[in-house]
Amino acid sequence: MASITLTPSEKDIQAFLEHYQTSLAPSKNPYIRYFLKLPQATVSIYTSGKILLQGEGAEKYASFFGYQAVEQTSGQNLPLIGTDEVGNGSYFGGLAVVAAFVTPDQHDFLRKLGVGDSKTLTDQKIRQITPILKEKIQHQALLLSPSKYNEVIGDRYNAVSVKVALHNQAIYLLLQKGVQPEKIVIDAFTSAKNYDKYLAQEANRFSNPISLEEKAEGKYLSVAVSSVIARDLFLENLENLGRELGYQLPSGAGTASDKVASQILQAYGMQGLSFCAKLHFKNTEKAKKRLER
């Protein structure tokens, strides 16, 4: 199902509503000003000014605002910002988010370097090529440490909204550097509807439309670059945290994490665990139970 997010002017929004007023429908979402049920598409107009179009006819109605669809096969042939995050599924370590700006003339260089989805590259290869990428590619990297992560989760953010905030901030800061992308792609970690809902609470905003696409790291080199740099940043953070505590911290959230967590808990208490791990994971309770044996 096609999903398009736009930020048109209020004048264009009102013109759209007038044109399709017979399709207005009620919505229980407090963040939605207007909701329209159209043939082959739904349109949600949010209080933030964003518009979300979903359905097979999304592109048709988006054209009302001047939107022009880009064929998937030619998507690479545009100057793009792509974002990705690493660390979301790991108990230990922070959450790394990177936005990278890649132009078509950089594609050959990136392919020769071996850039692809970081999930298909060895950690050794990632550590090897990341310094080159950081030097050659305009990017913005953000790292939310475990201690800061634990501070904001359950207070202002949840596991999804904190990623929305980081992706948005990385893109915002990269745009501030003067790059001019024709498209912005986020490796989808939630629905466009959820993304826009959580985006409403963020202060830093930009007018460029974004596209959330599943497995985008395999479609766009800009997302692949972000994936690689983010993986390197996460691994570096994992090593540094482990070095400070005197433990080798495993990536992931399996039984190895439970074992190390129980050792850290015994040695340093919850304060030590909060320093290096995301406490809302189930591993925390499993580590406590290990100490009770």
Swiss-Prot record:
Protein residues bound to a divalent metal cation: D84, E85, D187
Keyword terms: Cytoplasm, Endonuclease, Hydrolase, Magnesium, Metal-binding, Nuclease
Reactions listed under catalytic activity: Endonucleolytic cleavage to 5'-phosphomonoester
Record-level GO BP terms: DNA replication, removal of RNA primer; mismatch repair
The record's free-text note on cofactor binding: Manganese or magnesium. Binds 1 divalent metal ion per monomer in the absence of substrate. May bind a second metal ion after substrate binding.
Entry superkingdom: Bacteria
Location(s), subcellular: Cytoplasm
Record-annotated membrane-spanning stretches: none
Annotated Gene Ontology cellular component terms: cytoplasm; ribonuclease H2 complex
PROSITE patterns found in the cross-reference section: RNASE_H_2 (PS51975)
Cofactor dependency: Mn(2+); Mg(2+)
Domain RNase H type-2: 78-293
CDD domains for this protein: RNase_HII_bacteria_HIII_like, RNAse_HIII_N
GO molecular function terms noted in the UniProt entry: magnesium ion binding; RNA binding; RNA-DNA hybrid ribonuclease activity
Keyword Nuclease tagged: yes
UniProt-listed Enzyme Commission number(s): 3.1.26.4
Function description: Endonuclease that specifically degrades the RNA of RNA-DNA hybrids.
Family to which this protein belongs: Belongs to the RNase HII family. RnhC subfamily.
Record's protein name: Ribonuclease HIII
Organism phylogeny: Bacteria, Bacillati, Bacillota, Bacilli, Lactobacillales
Gene it is expressed from: rnhC
